[in-house]
Amino acid sequence: MIFYEKSAAQYSSYKKRMRIPLEGGESEGGYLQNFCLRDGYLGGGVGSEQVTDGSVQISALFCVGGAIAGYAPSGKLCVGSALADSGFAFTGIPDCVALPDGDGMLLSDGQTCVSVTSAGANKLTLPFRTAVFAYGRLWRTSDGVRLYYGALDDYKEAAVGRGQTGYIDSPDAKGKILRLFFVKNEILVLREYGLQKLVAHGDEEEFAFEDILSCAAVNGGSAAATQNALFWLTAEGFRVWGDAKVNGYSQFFTPHVSLDSVRGAACGDRYFLQSQYTLPDGTVAEGLGVFDAQGGGYLIPQKAEGLVSVQNGVFFTHGGKGYTVTEKGNFLGGIAHRVWQSAPTQPFGCRALLGEVCVRSKGPFLLQIKSDEGSRALCFAGGLCRKRVLLAGTVFSFRVQAEECELYALSAVFQRGEDKV
């Protein structure tokens, strides 16, 4: 095959510049399913960092300040960096609330409550299924009907009396209390069929619930919150309250999520969901979904267990080891979440020469180009850059691998080839 130089009149017929959309996703160590792609951006990825060495098998990990706690498959509570047996046990993965001073946490399964700090673990008579610290008090419930509030600035005080510990019996048409959160300086009460706000300023006799919204049956395990937003799943889809907008998050995932045994977590503008996902081809994959406010969403095909968000961290376990989610790096199994693949491109329907590529980006990345006749790998440092490729073929594909990058434009210049007569 010979490539001929053409006159100006013939030039447009034999040479073309094409914009290359990055439409598909893949991973370094396994399959990565993209739910929604952001135009001009490679999508926000996450990595993970191992916290425990696996010498003690755990099903859930909790870290607040210098305090570390692990829930073992046997139900035992293990504490400290060595995950030593605390002598306490739970009937299931406990709920966790960080202490106001940031140096520890309270863990409870609704029957047993244990305080874990850097100094060790102690049992308290403050059982809860869900709890939150707000307005100088500890708010907790075990049965979803009676809501206890602690004494001001003394959460350990158990004596019931005016100005001390008290409770509110709160039967409601929206059902039992499933979760408590403190979002945008307000106590949010997520019930079986809706969301309320607890007005708890001033005199204790004036504490009251105010309705915010009603919704379909709520999955309590999916609920998670940041300082500014609350996320949860219902039988009819995904809900958000606060600064985030529901239409900012990928809507693809909700009809494809099994609501059995899901666990949610949140950090920054990201919502994490441990669940089983039905992929577009009909296969079912167990993994961790990650969704952000810009519409990005993807499935990490690794079995994550015990997903929790505590303070400003997201933790999970895999293979009995504890991990924390990080902003950078690879996930389990070497999965890199910033790897994106274009659809096959056939510029002329016959053999062609890829002469050059032009990119405009922020941040470095590796561009790999393949054709049916060969491949090229090019490194870009960022900014506006044009590089020669000189790769022949009929069908071309483009693959971008980046740790952290925004790709604003990717285009390629092709020249059609002619057979020598």
Positions of PLM-derived features:
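Hydrophobic or amphipathic alpha-helical targeting/insertion segments
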Residues: 97-124
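Hydrophobic beta-strand segments that make up the repeating blades of beta-propeller
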Residues: 68, 105-107, 187, 230
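Beta-propeller and closely related beta-pinwheel folds
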Residues: 49-57, 87-92, 121-137, 141-266
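Short beta-strand segments and strand-loop junctions that repeat across beta-rich extracellular domains
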Residues: 78-80, 112-116, 145-161, 198-200, ...
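Beta-sheet repeat architectures centered on beta-propellers
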Residues: 1-76, 81, 86, 90-100, ...
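Compositionally biased, intrinsically disordered low-complexity segments
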Residues: 5-7, 23, 119, 163, ...
